[in-house]
Regions:
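Cytochrome P450 heme-thiolate "Cys pocket" and heme-binding signature region
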Residues: 135, 418-452, 477-478
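Cytochrome P450
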Residues: 2-18, 74-81, 141-149, 156-173, ...
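Conserved cytochrome P450 catalytic core segment spanning the I/J/K helices
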Residues: 138-140, 201-202, 229-300, 327-346, ...
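Central I-helix of cytochrome P450 enzymes
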Residues: 167, 171, 175, 231-238, ...
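Conserved cytochrome P450 K-helix E-x-x-R motif and the immediately C-terminal K′/meander segment
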Residues: 47-68, 233-236, 240, 334-382
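Cytochrome P450 heme-binding "Cys pocket" and the immediately downstream C-terminal segment
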Residues: 311-314, 392, 445-483
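Conserved cytochrome P450 K-helix/beta-meander segment immediately N-terminal to the heme-binding cysteine loop
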Residues: 394-423
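N-terminal membrane-proximal hinge/A-helix region immediately C-terminal to the signal-anchor transmembrane segment
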Residues: 2-124, 128, 147, 151-155, ...
Length: 501
């Protein structure tokens, strides 16, 4: 009997230990959050709702937004406001830009991975990185050089079908001046880097819904153990990249020694080595790497997915390629001969392709959710109040599916919505928010379009694509970027003969 009582006591004690923190957490969530005040956005749930719907989080947000364009989820520290109202988005990203920042909570969550890079910073460090990077993205030489790099990578890609590696190769060469050569499959570290980077991305994002992540980090267990392991590998990989590029610049072996982003930051580090440390350089590179690799590779993956689901659109793009480049370039020609014809002038004429890529980004934005934190009390254009410390998030993924933004066919993939008399017509960046907007608008927008156009033109000219398994459900992995879960499996059928480069 004593043994039974002892076991019962232990069980009750364990339950008390486990349940009490949860009850305290719930109490903290609901106390003082103005739940029924009509001046504040309606509450539709708490942190635990995001945890429950985590594997389909962005679709859950879209379902809620169709009924309530601006809503709140409660967390222990503050209210988290979510919106698809373009007026609110313009307000926080442009009109009242100075009243919003990344916020302490966001920085605390992402600091281990992104450090003091451009995505995690505000103020002077953000301005410094953006200013230096803007010189490169606006330079004519980068445009010409990036076209050359993208064409070379595209020629390899047609032969080897290595979409993610091609994107990473291009980013490393154009952005950092280093030939990664991961398309050649010569280095296992390159494959490990891609996996470590994606896993670290997902594990860091998990912190937003894991109330115990700080405890796990302290004890170095479960998700935090794997995150720490991945970050260690990533840092070592990027540190080696910095050392390699620094040696190249010192030896002056690279004719493009000042025409990439990393080189400009390395030159700046010589002027002020105390501020521009190698650790700071590493943070900068990781942030630009996330922007470059994931925006293009993920978008192209979704692009080919929707093309497989809509074969007629594939045909239209191929017809446009032939019309713009000319029928003298045959399907059974050499790959390098074909990509050599893809000039800047050719890219500018590819209106239907541009519309199709943009339609892909509308429904499958590279960053599905992003946001800011209020540094002062505020009132959004839709009338809802924001308290100091509250988060305000705009849902790019959900916005692309809102009938009150795009019409009743919002969920249909229709490139024609972007065309008028065959000419591409852009929308307000606060309505089409895939590249952010306001002072923090994406510097690499044109860079990304250029790379995606060249790669997709090369692939579609030589191949017809279809899904390997039409019955398999394609979905995303919940993380900072919209990554296809387990990758996209497609069959590439040659249109005619193919002579490799």
């Amino acid at each position: 009997m004593d043994i039974v009582y002892a076991i019962f006591t232990c069980i009750v004690s364990l339950l008390f230990i486990c349940v009490t923190p949860v009850l305290v957490l719930v109490l903290r969530i609901y106390v003082g959050k103005t739940i029924r005040n009509p001046n504040y956005a309606p509450v539709v749930g708490t942190l635990f709702h995001q945890l429950f719907y985590y594997n389909r989080l962005y679709d859950y947000q879209a379902e809620v937004a169709k009924k309530t364009p601006t809503f709140r989820l409660l967390s222990p520290e503050q209210s988290e406001h979510y919106t698809t109202d373009s007026r609110n988005i313009e307000h926080i990203l442009k009109t009242n830009f100075g009243k919003y920042s990344k916020g302490k909570r966001n920085q605390e969550i992402i600091m281990d991975l992104f450090g003091e890079g451009i995505f995690a910073m505000d103020g002077e460090k953000w301005k410094q990185q953006r200013k230096l990077a803007s010189f490169e993205f606006s330079a004519r030489v980068l445009r010409d050089f990036s076209c050359t790099v993208f064409r070379k990578r595209a020629a390899k890609l047609v032969s080897k079908e290595l979409l993610m590696r091609c994107s990473l190769d291009s980013i490393f060469k154009v952005g950092f001046g280093v030939d990664l050569n991961c398309m050649d499959g010569s280095s296992g570290d390159d494959n490990e880097f891609i996996k470590a980077f994606d896993d670290a991305n997902a594990l860091t994002y998990w912190r937003y819904v894991d109330p115990l992540w700080k405890l796990k980090r302290f004890f170095n267990i479960r998700s935090e153990f794997f995150l720490k392991k991945n970050i260690k590998f990533i840092r070592e990989f990027v540190d080696e990249l910095i050392r390699t590029r620094r040696k190249q610049l010192e030896m002056k072996q690279d004719s493009m020694d000042k025409e990439d982003i990393l080189s400009r930051f390395l030159l700046e580090s010589k002027k002020d080595p105390e501020k521009m440390t190698d650790q700071y350089l590493r943070d900068i590179i990781l942030n630009f790497m996330l922007a470059g690799k994931d925006s293009t590779a993920n978008t192209l993956s979704w692009f080919f997915y929707v093309l497989c689901k809509n074969p007629l659109i594939q045909v239209k793009i191929v017809e446009e390629v032939r019309e713009v480049i000319g029928n003298n370039m045959k399907d059974n020609g050499r790959v390098d001969d074909f990509v050599a014809t893809i000039t800047e002038q050719v890219l500018e004429k590819m209106h239907y392709l541009h519309a199709t890529l943009t339609e892909t980004l509308r429904l499958y934005p590279a960053v599905p959710v992003d946001g800011r934190c209020a540094d002062a009390d505020d009132v959004l254009p839709d009338g809802f109040h924001i308290r100091k410390g509250d988060g305000v998030y705009y849902m790019s993924y959900a916005m692309g599916r809102m009938p009150y933004i795009w019409g009743n066919d919002a969920e249909d993939f229709r490139p024609e919505r972007w065309l008028k008399d065959g000419i591409f017509q852009p929308e307000s960046p606060f309505k089409f928010i895939a590249f952010h907007a306001g002072p923090r608008i994406c510097l690499g927008k044109d860079f990304a379009y250029r790379q995606m156009k060249i790669l997709s033109m090369a692939l579609l000219h030589f191949f017809r694509f279809k899904l390997s398994d039409d019955m398999k459900v394609v979905t995303y992995r919940t993380m900072f970027t919209l990554h296809i879960n387990e990758g996209l499996q497609v069959c590439a059928v040659p249109r005619r003969g193919l002579v490799e480069a």
